[in-house]
Amino acid sequence: MGEAEKFHYIYSCDLDINVQLKIGSLEGKREQKSYKAVLEDPMLKFSGLYQETCSDLYVTCQVFAEGKPLALPVRTSYKAFSTRWNWNEWLKLPVKYPDLPRNAQVALTIWDVYGPGKAVPVGGTTVSLFGKYGMFRQGMHDLKVWPNVEADGSEPTKTPGRTSSTLSEDQMSRLAKLTKAHRQGHMVKVDWLDRLTFREIEMINESEKRSSNFMYLMVEFRCVKCDDKEYGIVYYEKDGDESSPILTGFEIVKVPDPQMSMENLVESKHHKLARSLRSGPSDHGLKPNAATRDQLNIIVSYPPTKQLTYEEQDLVWKFRYYLTNQEKALTKFLKCVNWDLPQEAKQALELLGKWKPMDVEDSLELLSSHYANPTVRRYAVARLRQADDEDLLMYLLQLVQALKYENFDDIKNGLEPTKKESQGSVSESVSNSGIGSAEIDSSQIITSPLPPVSSPPPASKTKESSDGESLEQDLCTFLISRACKNSTLANYLYWYVIVECEGQDTQQRDPKTHEMYLNVMRRFSQALLKGDKSVRVMRSLLAAQQTFVDRLVHLMKAVQRESGNRKKKNERLQALLGDNEKMNLSDVELIPLPLEPQVKIRGIIPETATLFKSALMPAQLFFKTEDGGKYPVIFKHGDDLRQDQLILQIISLMDKLLRKENLDLKLTPYKVLATSTKHGFMQFIQSVPVAEVLDTEGSIQNFFRKYAPSENGPNGISAEVMDTYVKSCAGYCVITYILGVGDRHLDNLLLTKTGKLFHIDFGYILGRDPKPLPPPMKLNKEMVEGMGGTQSEQYQEFRKQCYTAFLHLRRYSNLILNLFSLMVDANIPDIALEPDKTVKKVQDKFRLDLSDEEAVHYMQSLIDESVHALFAAVVEQIHKFAQYWRK
């Protein structure tokens, strides 16, 4: 290989000198401004643009990489020009070759003087320092100048100096490449011919520049020579060829922090100073300004699950006296208190008595696990005393669960000492039983023998009366005292507590809680024994109910053990019900029905009892009522009804809240009562599954026309029935959406002849669903066609009712969230999966972050999404085929 064919190069990282750049000449004509521009800016007349000779231009040069400057700009020295701009000056840039990144580029801006101390850009151009193969540029380059702008150092640049957008520029670029190849020795050098060729190239370039509308700046990059050999500068990083390990995944680095989980002394000191007794008098008359008042109102409107920041807590504490006239602010104030500091707790409790009394429904929050202070909890109980029995009944299920957060020792200390002469003594009956079963223990508490019915001693009566009226009642004492005054409350309190007493999972997981509920039942039994004649009769009726349910469970077990098909089991069921000697269920003394104690029953009608087609075969039973009527129920054995019981209680509460707002959505909150974790009662409503309606009648409207025809009504249907159907659809769509009810299909949507649509089977709640991609609410094409289609007046009324119901329920969101917060430890299947997320799931459905107008638009989108859900329709057909093959 000849010397001329060798390529000599040096790495950029080894060339430890500054980059140099020569500014040559500027070719082309500057375009003068229009007369309009001169009139608008008279200073233009005195700028270099209007000089007779060439104006005194100068050039600035700056290196950029990735749009960021690498060094300060440098500029050419002053030079006076006459006929052409020619600086012919080398600029030493304040950056060295090893410091240049691969994508470095130099931005050149030409400036003209424009008045005192001011300059304007004549144009700018940008060129990369390294070529596409990593070679540092060398030799002369003509760069296209973009007029009236500064050079752009971003990547990609808006002012590229090397471009080939026109034919003339293509010619210049081709000649520049040939010149470069000649310089690098890729062509045979002939001196006389080279001189002629270079002269011709210069003439062509000059001609092309003059014919174009752009200006061109000629620059020269320095060549590196050593021993008369020209070296190319190749971009290279030091140690760049060394391999380095690359992590394919994330690696957790544990850094020990000796102060982790320790007290922050600064925050603690600030907290103590802010809450000290010295600040009390100064805070007493403190009133917020408008901005602070708005901030306090926002804090007060937070949902109960919202955690206050330290700044918000300090703000509420600072204006605590101002907030005492706002009942909604009390729970937020109590969240700010550090109950471990005695002085702070003392101040809070003193202020508690001066605070404007809070609403009954808001006091439920103070009974949750977040409030352990006994005085605060007793304050909540005192507020509950203002609720009537009907309202108390709506919260009773949650109040029984709230007993888990009470002081267990206080509940136990409330027990009366055992007396030998008291045949109804709970402790004696339990201790003598010798049976470890929780179910038998709890039932024995209420079914133990009664002493003769007579008036109790005056002293006992006085004590009970004083206890009942005491403002210092704990929750257990309050519930028992109210139950002793109302037989309906007593009925449900007994069954709610009895389920907690017999829960085997609770007994094994948390024996202290199990023992607490046994003590509650013992105290309840003692209170009933100490009451007057009517109260003691109440106890005997509860005992009779327990005996009746035990016999019914025994009967269902016998039927389930019976071999054969459903017909044989039906015959066995009716035979056992008719056998009064063995079961004694068809003719009993008058007792309240546990499911609905206002209804008095005399027994079960054997001939009408049937078993449903189901794996567990629940029984449909007709009870003989006191007035000779029939009361149909479903008794399920082998199924936990506590989840259905909770959902139906919430639906019943929502129905009451909506009626309070004069909105009757024709809901059907049928009654459910779990008498154990394995069995319970459900009210039977005469109705037909929507799937069966579609199979037999073809459509929902045909079903209504059959049972409620009307010539004047919409589509030949009674207007009242259609109105009921539309409202019940709207109510259940909104409610099931809020509660996240899943597994919705046309077999668990029932329809009555009066137009009421309602849901059953709440095995999946809070967003759980066995089907993939469920719609937000169950609203399919057949249901909409039952209203007359999406263009009908009834469908528009349905949407309006949905919006109204959603807005009303959002206003009661705190009450609903408080009820769910008391159920997080209730061991209900879908709540037990993620108890810490239960309340958040319900809160998210309310979309409390939206205004009322935004909430209406949100509900509109949910309805539209549900109506047009294609995948839900496919799943419905799959379910229909599955049901067909099962039959």
Curated annotation (Swiss-Prot):
Top EC category: transferase
Sites of Phosphothreonine modification: T163
Disordered as annotated region, ranges: 150-170, 416-435, 446-468
Description of post-translational modifications: Ubiquitinated via 'Lys-29'- and 'Lys-48'-linked ubiquitination by UBE3C, promoting its degradation. Deubiquitination by ZRANB1/TRABID promotes its stabilization, leading to autophagosome maturation.
Principal subcellular localization: other
Domain PIK helical: 282-520
Name listed for the protein in its UniProt record: Phosphatidylinositol 3-kinase catalytic subunit type 3
Native source organism of the sequence: Sus scrofa
Gene for this chain: PIK3C3
